[in-house]
Amino acid sequence: MKNRRFVLSSAAALASGVMLAARRSQAAVVATGPALSVDERALHAINRLGYGPRPADATAMAAQGADKWLERFLTEQLEPRRLPQPQDLSARLAGLDVLKLGQAELLGRYREAVKAAREARREQAQGMKADADALNAVREKVRPLVAQAATARLSRALQSPAQLEEVMTEFWFNHFNVFAGKNAVGVLVADYEQRAIRPHVLGRFRDMLGATARHPAMLIYLDNAQSVVAGYEPPQRARRFLAERPELKARVPSGLNENYARELMELHTLGVDGGYAQRDVTELARMLTGWGLDTRKALVGGTGDLFAFDARKHDAGSKTWLGQTVQGGGQAEGEHALDVLAAHPATARHLATKFAQAFVADDPPTSLVQKLADSFKATGGDLREFTRTLIGADEFWSREAYQAKFKTPYQYLLSSLRALDLQPADPRNLLAA
């Protein structure tokens, strides 16, 4: 009976939480109400640090007692590698090509599809009948890859016992967001999550920052692969090729692009009020010139990672960035910039605020933000300790924080499916709904 009450209370929390969140979102959370009961703490933990309880969680809680269940849950969630993955989840993930292909292979498939589509348009423009079957065959090498990325994320969120890892993967993926609808980013999203985000969500922020900076999904999305020193000229072989294909000249990088440098400081690290000026954006963009892709691997059917630093595209001059002179040093300039940004006090404050907003309240207590910022600085950006600080904070467990957050439609869907213990045969049907 207690199992049923726990699951029902979770379902009720989905609805009542919306009303409570609406009332509480207008004011900062301050721990003034009565302490949460142990059952409420358990429900709060699995809803805020996971995607909600499944019936099996209710059974375990009844068998162990809410207090012991909660203690074990919090301990295990901070060590996700110790939690065995269900066999059916492992089998589902093993069947997804997008998780097995390398970056060069993924980009190669995308380019093959683009080339086929371009050829079909050319034939149609000349009054010829395009080979629809051949075109569709090529496109079908790409379409499933985009859908499989979402399938992998949804399947893990529903079935993985490492719920904290899944929630943190969502948080940090959103923090380092890329848009799947831009060029080849869609086929690279799964690799981006798998290689640049997921391994670091309980690791070090600096490692995640570097992994995202060097990933082709980010380099394409924010155009850093197209950012080059002023006056850059392609190699002679490339110039001969372009002379034969003048329609491709528009794709040749022609100058500095500040998109990634701006997002890197404004969103990923310092924050909009992080104490930098437009000149700092420009100088950082100069430091990051040459950070791009070795697309030849995709053209010749190669394998492996695509990131490459091209010294010919790099601005080797000295820069003045955040009040300091940076001498020309090639790729090391960009790595130095990432070191500085990861360790900057404004980054600690920005991430602490965003973290507290995501897991406690839209207007979080300043005391909690300070605790998180102090933890980030003291540990050199250790995200496991950063998360542990959140879980250990009184503000997280306050009555005012309980059911004080809206669930996103994605989170609400996952919580509902988990409460009903449903695993869709094909998650793509849900994503398309």
Locations of the language-model features?
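Non-catalytic regulatory/linker segments of enzymes
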Residues: S9-A15, P34-D39, Q163
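Short, flexible active-site-proximal loops enriched in glycine and acidic residues
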Residues: L164, M168, A180-L188, Y221-D223
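Basic/aromatic-enriched alpha-helical hairpins
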Residues: F173-N177, V189
